[in-house]
């Protein structure tokens, strides 16, 4: 039995979303969904996760045989009515952008299935999803493979438009903490079609992300 799985069935708590960035114009309900491979703070109003967190480790990433990615996107069984979003994304022109990426989960079939829940997705322009966002995902895995344990937090903020009932976030962000070296890195990405900046140009202070989101990051 995996650690988070012990809490899986009904570890759902509701928080009135009043302390987060003023970019949110309405009070919003956030549902905490604890899965075996990640925890999602999912907005029922925006229909995307405002924060997702997990640990990348050598053990998590280091298998010799990986499960194949099948792209079976699905509602989250902990919150199916709020995460049945396949039709909203279909034909929208936006990628179903993973927060906890598939490549972090291919050593465990349960992890891989869970990471395709819509509670782990946000609409991203392909240029972001396949560009600097993917570059940072790879960088994070390399840190974990070399230095053993990396805590990852990432999420989305704001709403510039909608695809069906799903808000398109204005920004995406990620914070990582490397346990062995006690090094932190933080990034904020504009969710726009044109992506001209390199990853290093998007680096910010952790305190900047805390101010933007209202989250306090502690490993």
Predicted regions mapped to residue ranges:
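Extreme N-terminus nucleophile/cap motif
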Residues: 19-36
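Short linear sequence motifs
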Residues: 7-13, 31, 35, 66, ...
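Bacterial Sec-dependent N-terminal signal peptides
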Residues: 1-23
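Short, surface-exposed charged micro-motifs
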Residues: 30, 39-41, 174-176
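Domain-level detector of nuclease and nuclease-like folds
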Residues: 77-219
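Short, His- and charge-rich active-site/binding loops that engage polyanionic ligands
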Residues: 33-95
